[in-house]
């Protein structure tokens, strides 16, 4: 059977999967090297590692979003999101749109909030840790307490779809994005970085860490963000302060990012790549 194998992550990319009882089997059979399988990776680093480790060629098809459909807007439902967080009109809503796992570098987000010298230093995190335990979350809370930052999980307010439970609104992640003033995404490692595409889609000011795949496959295309290089420095903090008070400059930059994303990470790009892939069978 002709098969397309689409690889988002490989076991060798995660330290937590390195201790196992079937390493020989994994190293020799996963993924399978067969003539009827065409392999797809989501970044150029994974492509190179797959070739080096298994001798398997692949094509890169990056993650995409429907950039030809305009993003949602603030409406009668989501206009209450900030107040449901307990925010006042002049408070900053700083969103970390990730799970609570160590490779997300959330300690850098906490430090950013601390160094912005806000009257109410708060960081809101959209998702729980899931299967990676609570030790990192406990450590983050201690770090935040030392730095005087109020870190809040808001997963109880966010669901796959909008709705109401016991007369309380449940919002979509898009509702959270639309209400934010600053998105933090200081990841140390990502297979691609969906939150980057999402932040581009909603045209919001974003600070990110230059993780390897970003450096290899996203930054060279011309996108512009506030960048960290593994740590928070005063230059980045000053840039955040300046842009938070420069909505026209943010609008210009985010519009340019949106146009670049339409060119490189749209559904039309995916369709063209899939047509090329299927034509090889």
What would you call each of these model-derived segments?
Residues 134-175:
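Nucleotide-activated donor-binding/catalytic signature segment of Leloir-type glycosyltransferases, i.e.
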Residues 11, 20-40, 48, 52-53:
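Membrane-proximal helix-turn-helix segments that form the acceptor-binding/catalytic region
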Residues 188:
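Aromatic "clamp/platform" in nucleotide-sugar-dependent glycosyltransferases that forms part
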Residues 244-278:
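A charged, aromatic-enriched C-terminal amphipathic alpha-helix characteristic of glycosyltransferases
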Residues 205-209, 225:
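Short hydrophobic beta-strand element within catalytic cores of glycosyltransferases
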Residues 45, 64:
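Carbohydrate-associated surface elements
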Residues 82, 88-104, 110-113, 123-125:
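Conserved donor-binding/catalytic core segment of Leloir-type glycosyltransferases
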């Amino acid at each position: 059977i002709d098969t397309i194998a689409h690889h988002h992550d490989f076991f060798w990319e995660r330290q937590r999967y390195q201790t196992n009882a079937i390493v020989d089997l994994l190293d020799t059979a996963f993924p399978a090297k067969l003539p009827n399988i065409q392999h797809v990776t989501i970044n150029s680093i994974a492509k190179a590692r797959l070739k080096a480790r298994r001798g398997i060629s692949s094509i890169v098809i990056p993650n995409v979003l429907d950039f030809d459909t305009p993003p949602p807007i603030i409406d009668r439902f989501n206009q209450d999101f900030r107040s449901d967080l307990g925010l006042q009109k002049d408070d900053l809503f700083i969103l970390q749109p990730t799970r609570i796992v160590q490779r997300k570098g959330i300690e850098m987000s906490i430090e950013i909030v601390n160094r912005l010298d806000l009257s109410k230093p708060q960081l809101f995190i959209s998702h729980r840790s899931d299967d990676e335990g609570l030790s990192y979350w406990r450590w983050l809370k201690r770090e935040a307490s030392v730095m005087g930052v109020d870190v809040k999980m808001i997963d109880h307010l966010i669901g796959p779809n909008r709705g109401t439970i016991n007369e309380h609104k449940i919002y979509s992640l898009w509702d959270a994005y639309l209400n934010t003033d600053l998105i933090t995404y200081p990841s140390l490692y990502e297979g691609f970085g969906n939150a980057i595409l999402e932040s581009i889609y909603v045209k919001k000011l974003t600070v990110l860490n230059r993780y390897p795949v970003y450096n290899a496959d996203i930054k060279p295309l011309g996108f512009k963000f506030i960048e960290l290089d593994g740590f928070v420095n005063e230059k980045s903090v000053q840039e955040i302060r300046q842009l938070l008070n420069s909505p026209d400059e943010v609008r210009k930059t985010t519009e340019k990012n949106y146009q670049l994303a339409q060119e490189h990470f749209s559904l039309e790009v995916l369709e063209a790549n899939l047509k090329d892939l299927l034509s090889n069978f």
